[in-house]
Amino acid sequence: MSMTDPIADFLTRVRNANLARHEVVEAPASKIKKSIAEILKAEGFIRDFEYIDDNKQGVIRVFLKYGEDRNRVITGIQRISKPGLRKYAKAEELPKVLNGLGIAIISTSAGVITDKEARSKQVGGEVIAYVW
């Protein structure tokens, strides 16, 4: 059976593993999931990730990050644009997550980037998710 929203599945796997305080989570890979993982790593929400080629779709392995006393670095992840209801924003209308404490992940013509990068490049796009 095919999956309706693979991005939501990936974000849910990361959220659930984070809540259960797992060190590693695996999900089926895709280019957009790899881009999302790169953003999460660059913004300091995860330790690292790796792509594992299994001669099929591939697997993306995400290494979660925790603070002192195993406090969660990712407080929340929310999928915004869904297959049944896409959400787009112009460059000047891009949302700020928790007044700049979180990030919005945006799919633009310049690739998958954060809301801060999209504002500086003056590009809008599809608002994939919020992470805080």
UniProtKB/Swiss-Prot annotation:
UniProt keyword annotations, A-Z: Ribonucleoprotein, Ribosomal protein, RNA-binding, rRNA-binding
Presence of keyword Metal-binding: no
GO biological process, one term: translation
InterPro entries in alphabetical order: Ribosomal_uS8, Ribosomal_uS8_CS, Ribosomal_uS8_sf
Organism: Leuconostoc mesenteroides subsp. mesenteroides (strain ATCC 8293 / DSM 20343 / BCRC 11652 / CCM 1803 / JCM 6124 / NCDO 523 / NBRC 100496 / NCIMB 8023 / NCTC 12954 / NRRL B-1118 / 37Y)
Self-association and partners: Part of the 30S ribosomal subunit. Contacts proteins S5 and S12.
Keyword Endoplasmic reticulum appears in the UniProt entry: no
Family in the record: Belongs to the universal ribosomal protein uS8 family.
Annotated Gene Ontology cellular component terms: ribonucleoprotein complex; ribosome
Recorded GO MF terms: rRNA binding; structural constituent of ribosome
Protein name per the record: Small ribosomal subunit protein uS8
